[in-house]
Design a protein with these regions (language model features):
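Short, thiol/selenol-centered motifs that function as redox-active sites or metal-ligating centers
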Residues: 71-95, 159-163, 255-282, 289-290, ...
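Short acidic alpha-helix initiation/capping motifs at coil-to-helix transition points
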Residues: 45-50, 80-84, 129-138, 232-238, ...
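Alpha-helical scaffold segments that form or flank carboxylate-/histidine-based iron centers
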Residues: 33-39, 66-79, 110, 150-157, ...
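Acidic/His metal-coordination segments adjacent to aromatic residues that form catalytic metal sites
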Residues: 106-115, 294-301
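Long, compositionally biased
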Residues: 137, 170-197, 286, 318-338, ...
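Amphipathic, Lys/Arg-enriched alpha-helical patches that create a basic surface
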Residues: 153-170, 339-356
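Secretory/endomembrane lumenal or extracellular ectodomains immediately following the signal peptide
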Residues: 1-67, 93, 100-103, 175-254, ...
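Acidic/histidine-rich alpha-helical segments that form the ligand environment
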Residues: 118-157, 302-343
Length: 362
């Protein structure tokens, strides 16, 4: 496999926007600089989601940080996400993993001599990310045979789903990976590595089980969220979905179309049924919905909706340079805020539909 830094990557689609308040929140919560958020900050629910999901990746209930790092590497590698891979690589270096070991992992993660338990988790995570075909009962049984309990399996899937989200956000926006790729070799990082490692590890303490409150058990895609109940990620996902749906940057019908296109492409009946009901509530008839999802076009779509539908389909599986070029084209007909929300909604859709498939397979 070629090195991640050799993957073609377009120039960044967005100009950075500094937000000192958000930067302070992020640093306090994660122990790290804000990183990519400065490029797409300004959409309230997405700012919050980025912070919550970063904390959820760092703090696990039942699996250890080393496994989380390996899952992050394999999912980012599977999605050809140079930014997330470089970020994970840098964190592993800061936390003390030797460069030689990381380079071996980068060349071929699954050729490494992992024990049966680690390999089962990584195989599952890669199949979850790729979703072509998605994991099925046999994959769950393989995890159980390897010694994982139900909470650990859900947590492995949750970590992989968060990476699916971040991989798309950072790749589609073409966030520049170059400084992150060089970060571990900077003199000041080498000098202060013990302090940086302490700050990062302190922010990644073990999380506690957090059952959802009664009012968090309702809302769009509640059945999928309830399948994660007990993990702090379930609360983050509930709040994310509520914030996304309440946002007025894109119309609800536009967001529902994105969700519907992704659920059809991935074959997620759970999400597909619910999003079909959302589209009916937004004024589309059943035969119109079927026409849109079958042909990705329809006379009932506005020009903007047509653009959104076509773009959403491309986010399911992609090559980085091509999806970045398509993103640049999509920007021409949308405001910055609309484009940022479109990418965020499509990324959430890819996450939620993969989780929805698991709910049916487990």
């Amino acid at each position: 496999m070629s090195l991640m830094r050799e993957i073609p990557w377009e120039s960044c689609l967005l100009e950075p926007r500094r937000d000192p308040k958000l930067e302070r929140r992020f640093r306090r919560a994660t122990g790290r600089p804000i990183g990519p958020v400065i490029y797409y900050s300004g959409t309230s629910w997405l700012d919050d989601t980025t912070l919550w999901f970063n904390v959820n990746v760092a703090k696990q209930v039942s699996i250890d940080a080393d496994l989380v790092g390996l899952i992050a590497m394999i999912v980012s590698q599977d999605n050809s996400c140079r930014f997330c891979f470089a970020e994970t690589r840098a964190l592993l270096r800061i936390l003390g993993m030797p460069e030689r070991r990381i380079s071996q992992l980068e060349h071929d993660l699954l050729s490494e001599e992992f024990d049966e338990r680690e390999r089962a988790a990584l195989e599952f995570s890669r199949r979850f990310s790729r979703a072509n075909p998605p994991p099925d009962k046999r994959d769950f049984d393989a995890l159980r045979t390897a010694g994982y309990d139900e909470l650990q399996i859900i947590e492995i899937a949750s970590v992989a789903s968060i990476l699916v989200f971040f991989n798309r956000v950072t790749t589609i926006f073409a966030l520049p990976p170059y400084s992150m790729e060089k970060l571990p070799d900077r003199w000041y990082v080498r000098l202060f590595r013990p302090l940086l490692a302490f700050a990062v590890s302190r922010a990644g303490n073990t999380a506690q089980i957090e059952p959802l409150e009664p009012d968090e058990r309702e809302g769009i895609f509640s059945e999928i969220v309830l399948g994660l109940d007990g993990l702090p990620f379930a609360r983050s996902l509930r709040r994310t979905l509520d914030g996304m749906w309440a946002s007025t940057v894109l119309a609800r019908r536009e967001k529902a179309l994105v969700m519907a296109v992704v659920s059809r492409a991935l074959g997620c009946p759970l999400a597909g049924k619910e999003v079909g009901e959302l589209l009916l509530a937004e004024g589309l008839r059943g035969e119109q919905i079927d026409e849109i999802l079958t042909h990705l076009t329809s006379p009932v779509l506005t020009a903007k909706e047509q653009q959104i539908v076509a773009f959403a389909r491309e986010t399911v599986w992609y090559e980085p340079a091509r999806i970045q070029q398509l993103g640049r084209n999509a920007m021409q007909g949308l405001s910055r805020e609309e484009f940022v929300e479109l990418v965020a909604v499509a990324s959430i859709a890819n996450m939620i539909c993969r989780l929805g498939i698991l709910a049916g397979a487990a």
